[in-house]
Amino acid sequence: MNALIKIISAVLLILNTASHANELTLTTEQGYALKASYYQSNQTSDRGVLLLHQCNYNRTMYNDIGQQLADKGIHALSLDFRGYGDSASGEFTPETFEALTKEERSVAWQALIAYWPNDVQLAYNYLKSKMSDKGIIGVIGASCGGSQAITLAENNPVSVIGFFSSGQSAENIARYQKALVDKPTLIIASEKDTGTFESAQKIFRSSTNISSKFIAYKGSAHGYPLLASDTQLASYMVSWLESQLVN
């Protein structure tokens, strides 16, 4: 019970961390409003990190990490995926999905995630606009955000990539192996988060960059609960990103 209380307290601490983020609205070509938090570097900087949340949470999971990055002189931007957090509106809301049948929900889900690559690209472009032509950007994807990180890195000069409790399909692992194995890669997974852990091992074995890291945890915690159970994890992620985002 005491351990549970400590974990809950740590979660609340993370989620209530005072943030100096600028709250943004990024508008797509179709006029859809995406909400994001921009953590502006406290100094002139040509480094940035795009933070993509997991599908059972929203961009606030990165409040602490985003602020720490900014304090290190690195621009950071966390995006609420369309249909999540403050980017849920119109046909893309939890209430709308709950009203659908199982079959309808599957179709609606595929329609929703089809928008995400362009939505993430819009966020990347905004972050890139805050830097010179020599700017370098990393991307971290938690859980479902990992596949979006792969797509973004395939199509843009992303320097660093991270998979935070992000299980990948065989197809996505092949995409990583084809185009991204030379990039510094941070991989975080719990041993009993079965499919995710197996995927993480495959990605780590595939990486050819000597700076790639695999952080393994006991248990089955998935994504942001790891930030609560290990209060040093956020700082480690920030330090690793800082060390790898170099020209």
Regions found by a protein language model. Give the residues of each.
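Sec-dependent signal peptide recognition
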Residues: 2-10
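Serine-hydrolase catalytic machinery in alpha/beta-hydrolase-like enzymes
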Residues: 26-130
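Primarily recognizes the serine-hydrolase "nucleophile elbow" in alpha/beta-hydrolase
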Residues: 122-181
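Short alpha-helix in the alpha/beta-hydrolase fold that links the catalytic acid
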Residues: 174-176, 192-206
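Short beta-strand/loop motif that positions the catalytic acidic residue
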Residues: 180-181, 187-189
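Acidic beta-to-alpha connecting loop that harbors the catalytic carboxylate
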Residues: 190-194, 219-221
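Catalytic histidine-centered segment of alpha/beta-hydrolase-like enzymes
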Residues: 220-230
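Catalytic active-site module of serine/aspartate enzymes centered on a nucleophile-bearing elbow/loop
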Residues: 229-247
